[in-house]
Amino acid sequence: MKKKVFLFGLLFSLLLLCGCGVNLTSTVKLNKDFSGTRVMSCTFSSRDFHSYFKGSKEDLNKLIKESCPDALTYTSSSSDGNDTYTFYLRFSSLDDYKKKVRDLLNFSPEITYEYGDSPFVSGLIYKENFTSKDLMTWLYTALYEGKYIDKDPSSDLWDLKSTKISFLGK
C-alpha cells in the first residue's frame, strides 16, 4: 500500500512539474535564391498561460502588437484550449535574412548556406549559430519589462520543440 501511495504521489508531482510553458516550433522555408520565410509558432495552454503570465490575454495581445519588431508579422488563433501566436520572418535573399536576424538578435549571425545540383555535388548545407528561442528574446524581454512574468530564465518559459528546414517545398 505504501508503494502505491508513493508511486501515486510521484506521478502527481511529475504532472504538476511538467507545465510546459510555451511550446515553440519553427520552420525555415527556403528557395534556391535564399528567399523564403521563417515561421515560428508559440503555443500554450490556458493552464500554462495562467501559471506564467500575470495579466489577461488582452494584455498579451496588446503587448505583442506594441512590441513586435518590424521584421516580423504575426497571427494568433485559439483551438482546443490552446492559444497559438505565429510569427513570420520573410526575406528576399541571404543578405536580407542576415540583416533581419541581426536586428532581432542584436549581434551578427553566422549562417552557412550552400546548395549544389550537379553530378558531383547535390544537396543543401544549412547551419546557423542561433535558435528560434534566440529570435523570440524580444518577447521575453517585453513580458519581463511589462512585469507580466518573473525573471526566470527564458529556458523555463520556452520549450523549443523543433526547427525544420523546408527546401523547394520539400
Language-model features: locations:
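Positively charged n-region of N-terminal signal peptides that target proteins for export
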Residues: 1-5, 9-11
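Mature, soluble, non-transmembrane domains
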Residues: 71-170
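Post-signal-peptide N-terminal segment of Sec-exported extracytoplasmic proteins
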Residues: 43-72, 128-139, 143
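Residue-level signal for mature regions of secreted extracellular proteins and peptides
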Residues: 13-14, 61
